[in-house]
């Protein structure tokens, strides 16, 4: 009723205001038509006062309406007061004027009243609906409007507490159950809860208020007492319902989120998810391979600007893609034909590359992880199995496949990054027979102009060391494979081991030898000559037996024996004198067609010495590597054969072991003097000789015989491979004899020269020839007796092809290491390195100087002693003992001890050996030198000062650090073998 009254009063006020406006207009007209009189003036004043009063009331009523919208109760009270006051003044005044006004405004006012009535009624209905909604909720469940004494909304508080805190949730559910039981119990009007904490009392107070009960505490103030009241009621929703709702919403939200993630993945599938899926599906080996390719491409781009590398990765990647389809079809077959050492990590059907465990010791100082070379075969198309680690090398291997016109000649060639003058070469597809082979340049993809043709297809890499803490020469893995038509075969490659101090080095892990049996119609299997040598520190005291990675060879010849006939039963007879066989580390493989020979040398560590040599041959005669010369300074064979000679050596730092470097050298035609290609070990006397006659291949053109010579080493030595370069095709001769001989002295300088000045007169060979009266019959050709040449000294007068080069870092000369592979600049004959090896010494050093090979006599050796034995940019430390040289003149022993603090920090023990001859400057002394630990004031020049390091690696690092700095003394490799037991016993006294 109040709302309807208010509406009627408002309409009356509006009508009165309109009447006043009409009266004003009438009065104005009268005032204009008539002259004003006093009565009229008085009426006008009265009308003006009435109008002002009406406007004032109307404005007040307007404010009241605005306030009524916000608060209906206030609107009801004030609107009634305004209506009562405004009704009286409008009655005053003559009735005639009021009637006239009503006549004039009757029509428009009715329309306006209808409109205003509708608007006001709609607004009031909305207000009523707003008021009725909470009132209905209160009638159903008034608990949601309950607040406690502090004004907290109980419903919101309880719901949040139930959802958030699990402990409080249990407490609230318990209290709810107890209160419900109390409400349903008509016998009790109050309930006393046990004493509880203040927080739980607070929860109980709020739950009791939520149920509409009185809640107080007892006299102690720790127990809550609740009483039933008239407002006590049970809420419509139980506490557990809020928890279920929350769980359902959370579950739905999680489900929606998962669905959204899946949809996002589907949406982005076209852009980025293919990369992610590829990443997920790739194995670790494939990821490492991809990483190595990208890393090689990046570093090749950077170093190519500095003149070190020329990256032709387009050809390499193309070959990798084409070879992947061919390789995958025969991997399983090749794997079954591959005899290899057993390892506990191997599985019977595994064709994947095996990754070695990463030990903690191998993660420091650039020590490489050792990988079994025979387990690198990969089942993936383009993978060659490699190890990924920081500071690793540029030349990661790629798989290169070629197919000849008749049959497929397959080789797994590590395609490593080349130096500036050499580019990567792929194995060309060769014609069926050597006689029909066109010139070499027609089969090469790319070759530098200044490279000589015999080694144009040699894939070798060179890399310079960078600025690092202790950098040394980088290690390269250059494979050199000879592969020929009409044979289906795999050429082995070995695992490349980076030097420990190299900042980044080549780590080429190429597949091992995997040979496919020759076709049915062929009588001769492909020949392969493998020289395998091992560092004693590689796998210390390994009981793992060695098995060659090729076809079984016929026999193991003893000293001075001839090869048996081909009809002999194949078998393996390794000769290992008094030592344990070590797991193989590197191999040198030269595969040649139509014949097969295996020459393997296995080396294991016993006291850091090379103790034995395994020589294994096949019954078939070997096939020589012919090279010819068509021009004066460019060596070019009449028919070319690509060769891969992978090799690697590594010495673990904690083991006193010496590596066996390999050097590959070539003799020009004018300087051969009847010599033939040879492979030799530079070792002390007492070597054994193994002979293997060779006969030319029946299907090949006239050739020069080849010969391999070396020793059965008893200490660390150097492997020297030598090739003769004949002027042209030679008439067939009797097979040459492979003989292991000893090289007494081997010295070599390094100096850049022009290609025309490659071979100096000093490199003329000084070789002795001997006659062989035991010819060997070829399977298809009768023998013809002829002399067989052999070298008494392998390294006499050789013009070497350098396979190892050391690069100094910008800060100073870098230090070499006892890990050798076929390295360096094999395609340039102007750089060559080979260290001198003195009799009985356990370590050697390298001297850089003029290009060429010098066979020095006693006087030459004395002249070069100081220069060649001081640690230079290419020195190699193989032992733990270094001599201290270049001390200041006149320094006493006590003063010198103060200079050796840096050595002591490296763990070295200084030994003062009395020089028997009294030579100043740290003379060599002898093995019988006595260690004196007494501190005297005598001169240090009277002693030979020896620093004994805990490991060869520590000695290597110390020599790097001290020789490259402004130290007052230098370290060099010991000239002789010091008895470590005597030195250690002297240091312990």
UniProtKB/Swiss-Prot annotation:
Residues 169-232 form the R3H domain. The keyword Plastid does not apply. The lineage of its organism: Eukaryota, Metazoa, Chordata, Craniata, Vertebrata. Keywords: Nucleus, Phosphoprotein. Residues 454-466, 493-517, 761-771 have a biased composition (Polar residues). It comes from Bos taurus (Bovine). It is found in: Nucleus. PROSITE patterns: R3H (PS51061), SUZ (PS51673). This is R3H domain-containing protein 2. It comes from the Eukaryota. Residues 320-331, 416-428, 705-727, 772-790 have a biased composition (Low complexity). Residues 36-56, 109-143, 277-288 have a biased composition (Basic and acidic residues).
């Amino acid at each position: 009723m109040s709302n309807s009254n208010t509406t009627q009063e408002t309409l009356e006020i509006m009508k009165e205001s309109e009447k006043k406006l009409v009266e004003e207009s009438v009065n104005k007209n009268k005032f204009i038509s008539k002259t004003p009189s006093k009565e009229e003036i008085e009426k006008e004043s009265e009308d003006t006062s009435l109008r002002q009063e009406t406007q004032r009331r109307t404005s007040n009523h307007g404010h009241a309406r605005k306030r009524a919208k916000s608060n209906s109760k206030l609107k009801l009270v004030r609107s009634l007061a305004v209506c009562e006051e405004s009704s009286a003044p409008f009655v005053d005044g003559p009735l005639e004027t009021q009637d006239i006004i009503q006549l004039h405004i009757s029509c428009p006012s009715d329309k306006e009243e209808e409109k205003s009535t509708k608007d006001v009624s709609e607004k009031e209905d909305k207000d009523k609906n707003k008021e009725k909604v909470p009132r209905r909720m209160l009638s159903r469940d008034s608990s949601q409007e309950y607040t406690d004494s502090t004004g907290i909304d109980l419903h919101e508080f309880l719901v949040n507490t139930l959802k958030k805190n699990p402990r409080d949730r249990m407490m609230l559910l318990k209290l709810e159950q107890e209160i419900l039981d109390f409400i349903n119990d008509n016998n009790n009007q109050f309930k006393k809860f046990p004493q509880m904490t203040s927080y739980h009392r607070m929860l109980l107070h709020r739950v009791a208020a939520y149920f509409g009960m009185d809640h107080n505490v007892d006299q102690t103030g720790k127990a809550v007492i609740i009483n039933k009241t008239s407002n006590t009621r049970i809420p419509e929703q139980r506490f557990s319902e809020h928890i279920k709702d929350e769980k359902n919403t959370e579950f739905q939200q999680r489900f929606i989120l998962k669905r959204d993630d899946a949809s996002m993945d589907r949406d982005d599938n076209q852009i980025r998810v293919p990369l992610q899926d590829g990443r997920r599906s790739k194995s670790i080996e494939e990821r490492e391979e991809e990483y190595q390719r990208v890393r090689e491409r990046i570093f090749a781009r950077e170093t190519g600007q500095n003149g070190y590398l020329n990256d032709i990765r387009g050809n390499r990647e193309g070959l990798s893609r084409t070879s992947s389809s061919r390789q995958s079809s025969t991997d399983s077959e090749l794997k079954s034909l591959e005899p290899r050492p057993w390892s506990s990590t191997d599985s019977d059907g595994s064709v994947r590359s095996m990754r070695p465990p990463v030990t903690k010791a191998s993660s420091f100082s650039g020590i490489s992880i050792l990988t079994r070379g025979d387990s690198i075969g990969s089942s993936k198309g383009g993978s060659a199995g490699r190890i990924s680690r920081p500071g690793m090398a540029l030349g990661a291997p790629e798989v290169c496949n070629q197919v000849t016109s008749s049959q497929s000649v397959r080789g797994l060639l590590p395609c490593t990054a080349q130096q500036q003058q050499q580019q990567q070469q792929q194995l060309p597809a060769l014609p069926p027979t050597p006689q029909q082979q066109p010139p070499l340049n027609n089969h090469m993809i790319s070759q530098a102009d200044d490279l000589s043709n015999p080694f144009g297809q040699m894939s070798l890499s060179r890399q310079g060391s960078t600025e690092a803490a202790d950098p040394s020469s980088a290690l390269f893995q250059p494979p050199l494979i000879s592969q020929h038509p009409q044979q289906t075969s795999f050429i082995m490659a070995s695992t490349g081991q980076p030097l420990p101090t190299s900042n980044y080095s080549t780590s080429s892990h190429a597949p091992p030898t995997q040979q496919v049996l020759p076709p049915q119609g062929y009588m001769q299997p492909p020949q392969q000559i493998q020289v395998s040598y091992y560092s004693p520190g590689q796998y210390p005291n390994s009981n793992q037996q060695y098995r060659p990675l090729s076809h079984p060879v016929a026999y193991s010849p003893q000293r001075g024996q001839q090869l048996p006939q081909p009809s002999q039963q194949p078998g393996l007879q390794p000769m290992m004198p008094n030592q344990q066989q070590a797991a193989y580390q590197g191999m040198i493989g030269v595969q040649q067609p139509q014949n097969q020979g295996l020459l393997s040398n296995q080396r294991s560590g016993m006291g850091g010495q090379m103790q034995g040599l395994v020589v294994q041959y096949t019954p078939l005669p070997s096939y020589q590597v012919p090279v010819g010369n068509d021009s004066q300074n460019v060596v070019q064979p009449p028919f070319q054969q690509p060769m891969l000679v992978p090799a690697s050596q590594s010495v673990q730092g904690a083991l006193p072991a010496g590596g066996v470097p390999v050097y590959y050298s070539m003799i020009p035609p004018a300087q051969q003097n009847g010599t033939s290609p040879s492979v030799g070990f530079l070792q002390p006397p007492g070597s054994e000789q193994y002979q293997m006659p060779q006969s030319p291949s029946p299907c090949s053109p006239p050739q020069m015989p080849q010969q391999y010579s070396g020793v059965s080493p008893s200490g660390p030595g150097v492997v020297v491979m030598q090739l003769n370069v004949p002027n042209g095709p030679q008439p067939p001769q009797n097979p040459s004899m492979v003989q292991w001989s000893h090289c007494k002295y081997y010295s070599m300088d390094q100096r850049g020269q022009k290609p025309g000045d490659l071979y100096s007169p000093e490199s003329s060979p000084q070789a002795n020839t001997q006659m062989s009266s035991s010819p060997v019959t070829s399977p298809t050709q009768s023998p013809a007796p002829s002399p067989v040449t052999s070298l008494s000294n392998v390294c006499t007068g050789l013009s070497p092809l350098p396979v190892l080069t050391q690069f100094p870092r910008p800060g100073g000369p870098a230090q070499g290491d006892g890990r050798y592979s076929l390295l360096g600049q094999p395609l340039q004959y102007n750089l060559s390195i080979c260290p001198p090896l003195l009799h009985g010494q356990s370590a050697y050093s390298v001297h850089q100087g003029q290009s060429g090979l010098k066979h020095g006599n006693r006087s030459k050796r004395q002249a070069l002693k100081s220069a060649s034995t001081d640690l230079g940019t290419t020195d190699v430390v193989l032992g733990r003992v270094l001599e201290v040289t270049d001390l200041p003149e006149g320094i006493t022993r006590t003063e010198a001890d103060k200079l050796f603090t840096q050595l002591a920090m490296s763990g070295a023990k200084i030994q003062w050996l009395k020089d028997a001859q009294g030579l100043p400057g740290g003379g060599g002394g002898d093995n019988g030198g006595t260690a004196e630990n007494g501190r005297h004031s005598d001169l240090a020049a009277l002693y030979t000062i020896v620093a004994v390091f805990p490991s060869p690696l520590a000695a290597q690092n110390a020599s790097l650090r001290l020789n490259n700095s402004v130290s007052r003394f230098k370290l060099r490799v010991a000239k002789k073998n010091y008895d470590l037991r005597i030195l250690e016993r002297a240091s312990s006294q």
